[in-house]
Amino acid sequence: MSQLKLEEISSVIEEKIKNFELDCDMAEVGKVVSYADGVAKVYGLNGVMSYEVLEFETGDKGVAANLEEDSVGVIVFGFGNNIKEGTSVKRTKSLMKVPVGDAVVGRVLNALGEPIDGKGEIETNEFSLIEQKAPGIMDRKSVHEPLQTGIKAIDALVPIGRGQRELIIGDKQTGKTTVAIDAIINQKGQNVICIYVAIGQKESTVAQVVRKLEEYGAMEYSVVINASASDSAAMQYLAPYSGVAMGEYFRDHARHALIIYDDLSKHAVAYREISLILRRPPGREAFPGDVFYIHSRLLERAAKLCDEKGAGSLTALPIVETQAGDVSAYIPTNIISITDGQIFLETDLFYSGIRPAINVGLSVSRVGGAAQIKATKQVSGTLRLDLAQYRELQAFTQFASDLDEASKKQLERGQRMVEVLKQAPYSPLPIEKQVVIIYAGAKGFLDSVSVKKVVDFEEQLHPFLEAKYPQVLEEIHTKKALDKDLEAMLRKVLEEFKLTYSE
């Protein structure tokens, strides 16, 4: 029998001790003191960070919103039906993150970045914090590239540039979402990733939007984030921040993105609900004092970055719903003061058949003019003024019947320009075609066409140009300006078309 050597035994024991790992998991755990309306009061989590993700033993998750002396107010993501007094809560020591990158494109997600379209998991290793600091002044560049929506009234009168924040505001059922969807459809082939964030919308409405995007082939460069009316207030509050985190990824990787928040009125209401349950003091219209800050920190993240940072951009089109056209309410005035202009949609215009129902007088773009192409500037330079004078004359003619010849002519021209700016939904127009039809209206080529036939004139003009003079459209597209030769050619083409056009 071989004897065991003492050295061997000691070396084996030493080896075992050296490689011994204590398999124990340290966790900071607290207990739920009370739970109601999607908010849990948790005791015993002293080292928790603001907006840190916390896990409940029931499998629910939430974020620490209120950090008090002896307890933490936690917003629960779902409805937390199984959470009750005594439920244990664990720290994750991480802030809220969502998946980003090309893996999310073409998908429908919830506010947490989880897929809800039945197309399987999102396969990505890239995640981003939903709360990020907005780029500073030195990291930005002034807006100078156009972001065309394909809507004549917007691209000519309220132009939007890449990196701009342009508010779409109006009563319900005035076509706000349609304007935003048109803008997404028009980004096809422009290398712009589009993110549509639905906040507090009906599930059926969101399904319709997704169907429209799929129908026009826009879903292949879009992401839809849905926090519907049936979701909790916490999900509705988080959705825009998840969306902007996904948009920032493309902005920071020298690419371009467009984000639509539909709509921020419902976002403010969701935040008000959470704040009141957290017992925060209410202010005007029962909104908490920091309701301005939740929107300003969200919209400031849309920017055009400087060349050193890759020259990427994130453009934001927030939507706000007004009550009976009241733009002086609390949330509308807040967001008007944050954004770089607004597109105001009016119920009266909508029902009188002027669609998109854009009130040109109240709509403005504070920085987009610098991004407008020269050709559009040339043809629509006096358009806003002409339309304002037409509206003034129109109001005057309701009382006075006899008008001088010049006023009559102005009235006739104005009526035709209003018709020119009409556009069917989901049919965005390339900028070169917009230039042609606005030029035709502004230079009097439509004066002999009856007002009712202006839309028909336009519908026939575009196929005529594409078939016989595609080089005219091509030149406008490449030159981005109307020089003397191109203008002369355009006049010749329009005169020729007028001869062939029959009403």
Swiss-Prot record:
What is the protein's major site of localization?
membrane
Q: Which PROSITE patterns match?
A: ATPASE_ALPHA_BETA
What biological function has been recorded for the protein in this entry?
A: Produces ATP from ADP in the presence of a proton gradient across the membrane. The alpha chain is a regulatory subunit.
| UniProtKB keywords | ATP synthesis, ATP-binding, Cell inner membrane, Cell membrane, CF(1), Hydrogen ion transport, Ion transport, Membrane, Nucleotide-binding, Translocase, Transport
| EC number per UniProt | 7.1.2.2
Q: What cellular component terms from Gene Ontology apply here?
A: plasma membrane; proton-transporting ATP synthase complex
Q: Mind telling me which Gene3D superfamilies this protein's record contains? A: 2.40.30.20, ATP synthase alpha/beta chain, C-terminal domain (1.20.150.20), P-loop containing nucleotide triphosphate hydrolases (3.40.50.300)
CDD domains hit by this protein: ATP-synt_F1_alpha_C, ATP-synt_F1_alpha_N, F1-ATPase_alpha_CD
Q: Which gene encodes it?
A: atpA
Q: Does the keyword Ion transport apply?
A: yes
Q: Where is this site: Required for activity?
A: S363
Pfam families in the cross-refs: ATP-synt_ab, ATP-synt_ab_C, ATP-synt_ab_N
The listed locations are:
Cell inner membrane
Q: Indicate what this protein is called per its UniProt record.
A: ATP synthase subunit alpha
Into which EC class is this enzyme placed? Answer: translocase
InterPro entries referenced in this protein's UniProt entry, alphabetically: ATP_synth_asu-like_sf, ATP_synth_asu_C, ATP_synth_asu_C_sf, ATP_synth_F1_a_nt-bd_dom, ATP_synth_F1_asu, ATPase_a/bsu_AS, ATPase_F1/V1/A1_a/bsu_N, ATPase_F1/V1/A1_a/bsu_N_sf
Assembly notes: F-type ATPases have 2 components, CF(1) - the catalytic core - and CF(0) - the membrane proton channel. CF(1) has five subunits: alpha(3), beta(3), gamma(1), delta(1), epsilon(1). CF(0) has three main subunits: a(1), b(2) and c(9-12). The alpha and beta chains form an alternating ring which encloses part of the gamma chain. CF(1) is attached to CF(0) by a central stalk formed by the gamma and epsilon chains, while a peripheral stalk is formed by the delta and b chains.
A GO molecular function assigned to this protein is:
ATP binding
Question: What organism is listed for this UniProt entry?
Answer: Helicobacter pylori (strain ATCC 700392 / 26695)
- Name the positions where ATP binds: G170, D171, K172, Q173, T174, G175, K176, T177
What the record says about family reads: Belongs to the ATPase alpha/beta chains family.
Domain of life the protein comes from: Bacteria
GO terms for biological process, alphabetical: proton motive force-driven ATP synthesis
